Each structure stands twice: as structure tokens, then as C-alpha cells.
Amino acid sequence: MIQSTQTWRVLAGGLAATAMGVTVFAGGTAAADPSPPAPPPAIPGVLPPASLPPIQSVTAVPGGITTNNRFVATPQAPGPAALGQPPLAVAAPVSESLHDYFKAKNIKLVAQKPHGFKALDITLPVPTRWTQVPDPNVPDAFAVIADRLGNSLYTSNAQLVVYNLVGNFDPKEAITHGFVDTQQLSAWQTTNASKADFDGFPSSIIEGTYRENGMTLNTSRRHVIASSGPDKYLVSLSVTTALSQAVADAPATNAIVNGFRVSSPTVSAPVPPQLGTR
């Protein structure tokens, strides 16, 4: 395992934390799109959904993903040599979750803790009012941050989990299962999804809504399979709010989703493209 003098970094509003060797930085607001299906009333300081970049239209996306998906690249017009060629086959959707896939491959998942963790550099922005909280309801939590001053019965939160993956497998094959655990949530509706690499690593991100305890929740969930030397890690981030708070909380959730980073201490990863702003 590659060792580094760098420690896990958390971005926050100009504060300094010394517990567990956490370094805190000031971070600006980026953008994601955990947005509700219907546009709510305008809120001061938050741009309306009309400011989103044009949504790309695709004709066939596997796995039950919406056909209006701004994560999918614009299809290129076929050149003269491509005309008349048969269309490419669409891969059949997978039914196993990532954890089911790893179990079938006899891959051992070893939960990691932030204290002394040096295999990867992980950046998790902490917006204003959000704080790191202990949460026994999150199995194997690496970090949990939440807005405990919000107005909703549901506390907006972000959960980070990191596992060392012990065993042999193909990360590109594994990440094809990245949507399944989220799609199995009650009354799940997808709004955006992508399996593009993230910081140079195989990754999946899916966003949408689901039902839990009588509430509709809006969530963004990303899996990253990161390498550090010969070792591989599953880094999973979920950012969730009540649907009724999705627009009001957008500056905070956007900052978390777009400011999140994963890199190997010895490899300079490319900066991924920003998601559309609200």
C-alpha cells in the first residue's frame, strides 16, 4: 500500500479541525443536480431550473435510466463511412448490486476509518451549517456530515463509506453494477445517471428520488473504484435531502457533489467536468 504524509482532507468554511488529523479548507459552491421532478417556487439566491445547460436526448439507455440525461454525451452525427452500418447493440442491464457482485467474486470488503488512512486522498466539502456527526445508522461509515439546522423533518446529510477490496476482479466490469443498489430503493425514479470515469477511476453516479418512511427523498449516489498501488478501494458517497428541501439545499448539496474528489497520493488525476448549475 502506498503511504503518504498527506491525510484525508475535508473542505469547510474557513475552520480548522485537529481531530483525527483532518485538515479543513474553505470551499466554494459547485453544482450538481439533485433536483425535484417539478419546479418549486423560486427561492432567493438560487437560480431557477431554467439555467441548467441543455439536456441531451438519447434514444436508448440501459438499466431503466431516463432518456433525458444530461450526463450522456451528445451523439455525434454519422460520417459518410458510418452511414448504412447496423446500430451498436445496447448492453443488457445488470441485476446484481455491487455488493452482490463482490460476494459472487469472493471479494472481501474491509471497512476503512479516517484516522491514519493514507492510501487515498479524499476531499469531502462541508458547506456552511453542515457539521460532521456520528451516525450509528450508517454501517461502516468513514464520515457523515449533516445540516442539523434545516427546516425539514428529514435531516439533509452526506454519507461517505470506504472499503478496501481484497481479491481479484475487473473494476470496469464491477462498476457496471453501480446503479443497481440505488435502483432497488422504494419507488425509485432516476433523473440523471452516468458511468463515466471520475478522477481517472471507474465510477458510477445516479440521481433521483425514492420513498422512505412516508417521505419523498432526493439523492445523489456515486461509487468510485480507486486504485492505490496494488490495492483497490470502493469509495461511496451519497448526498440526500427531502424533496421539499431540494432547491433550498441545492447550494450545499451541489458543493458536496461537485467538490468531492478521490485521488491516489502518487498520481495526479484529471479534474472531472462540472455538473450543470441550477
Curated annotation (Swiss-Prot):
First and last residue of the signal peptide: 1-28
InterPro entries linked to this entry: Lipoprotein_LpqN/LpqT-like
Keyword tags: Signal
Highest taxon, organism lineage: Bacteria
Cystine pairings recorded for this chain: none
Gene3D superfamilies: Mog1/PsbP, alpha/beta/alpha sandwich
UniProt entry tagged with the keyword Signal: yes
UniProt keyword annotation of Signal present: yes
Pfam families: Lpp-LpqN
Assigned protein family: To M.tuberculosis Rv0040c.
Protein's name according to its UniProt entry: Proline-rich 28 kDa antigen homolog
Organism for this UniProt entry: Mycobacterium leprae (strain TN)
